[in-house]
Design a protein with these regions (language model features):
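Conserved acidic carboxylate
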Residues: 10
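Residue-level signal for the "D+5" position in two-component response regulator receiver
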Residues: 32, 58-61, 105
Length: 126
């Protein structure tokens, strides 16, 4: 079985990097992106990305535009939008598997459990 591959989209390195390191320690291959444009480049350049975890307020195109693009161009990739913007809840619910269940600051264990649930829901691994 190959390592699940995740992209974390977060402009703040003090948030992004510790979460990425934690998920790596838990057995995931993690790519880090500072904005939606960088995340798109990673998704286009890498094979078999499983999950994209993006800040709803990501710079450039933003997390919602990224999620919309992923749904259209890469429908097999699971999308998680995170943030603390209550107004965005309805829109996030339309773009994510289960709505906006992650808030910031991230609880690393909650993120890990959420990612595991998403990956388990897609069926057998590649």
């Amino acid at each position: 079985m190959t390592q699940p591959r995740l992209v974390i989209v977060e402009s703040d390195i003090l948030i992004r990097h510790p979460l990425a390191e934690y998920l790596r320690e838990c057995g995931y291959q993690v790519f880090e992106a500072t904005d939606a444009d960088e995340a798109r480049s990673i998704v286009e350049g890498e094979n078999d990305i499983d999950v994209v975890l993006a800040d709803a307020d990501a710079p450039n195109a933003g997390g919602f535009a990224l999620a919309t693009w992923l749904r259209r161009e890469h429908p097999k990739i699971k999308v998680v939008l995170a943030g603390n913007v209550a107004v965005a809840a309805e829109k996030a619910g339309d773009l994510c598997e289960e709505g906006p269940n992650l808030s910031k600051p991230y609880d690393h264990q909650l993120v890990l459990n959420y990612v595991r649930r998403l990956l388990a829901s897609r069926g057998p691994s590649r």
